[in-house]
Amino acid sequence: MNEERRQLEHTVKTRVRYGETDQMGVVYHANYLSFFEIARTELIRLRGVVYSALEEDGLRLMVTEAGLEYHSPGRYDDVLAITARLAGSGPARVRFDYEVRREGEDEVLVTGH
């Protein structure tokens, strides 16, 4: 992977907690949006930007669209690797894409934007 692309993506890991699952031990679908936010925030932080500093300057980063595609379930106690990737930007818009995998596995569980 080239250096420029590496700077435009970041992967964080989190262990699925019991409260993030449904009665069957599967990650509740809406929790992936929280996982995406964690990865996105850390990617931005690595680029030297902190949300609170943006807010102090009167800027807000609002989510105006979110989409997820479920390929395979995450389960209680899985360690998930969530990758956020800067997919595009414009004068008033930034787009991030996401992939979720179990740590150490190639299978993509969830993709999103």
Where are these regions (language model features)?
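Short alpha-helix capping/helix-loop boundary micro-motifs
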Residues: 65-69
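Hot-dog-fold acyl-thioester-processing enzymes
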Residues: 2-64
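HotDog/MaoC-like acyl-thioester-processing domains
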Residues: 2-12, 45, 70, 75-79, ...
